[in-house]
């Protein structure tokens, strides 16, 4: 006798922790009652299922009922046409084209390369071929660098890196809008 009454506990031997907050015993026995009655019902239905199946197949009403529930009702077609396609269209036009693709084109490699190409074209228009123009351009470029590198300790509390980022992003947006 393997089980030796181990699943069964008398109500007088219940511990408070196991009594599931003082529920009545009949409440705890409901799963056993339903399991036993369900098993016996399934066994009895299985015995008469062959007779019921023959009666179901030969009856005109049951045959019509079966064919009614077996046909396609086009719920999936209605859902696809009206709900799913509108969500997919919105997702493609807003999130993909405007946000993802637009941000990648403006801030991604194509936007950066386009910006630098336009900047190089503008700078190349400044070239005249004279040495003193190049010397003057080098002087103009090195003056702020030398000035700010000497004064960085006193200016670092006034300079905010977020403003530099905003300036950089706005220049990309301005270049993108000017090309359109």
From Swiss-Prot:
EC no. given is 7.1.1.2
Q: Name one Pfam family in it.
A: NADH5_C
A GO biological process this protein is involved in? Answer: ATP synthesis coupled electron transport
Look up the record and report any one GO term of the cellular component aspect. mitochondrial inner membrane
Does Metal-binding appear among the keywords? no
Q: Which Gene3D superfamilies match?
A: 1.20.5.2700
Q: What is this protein called?
A: NADH-ubiquinone oxidoreductase chain 5
Identify the coding gene. Answer: ND5
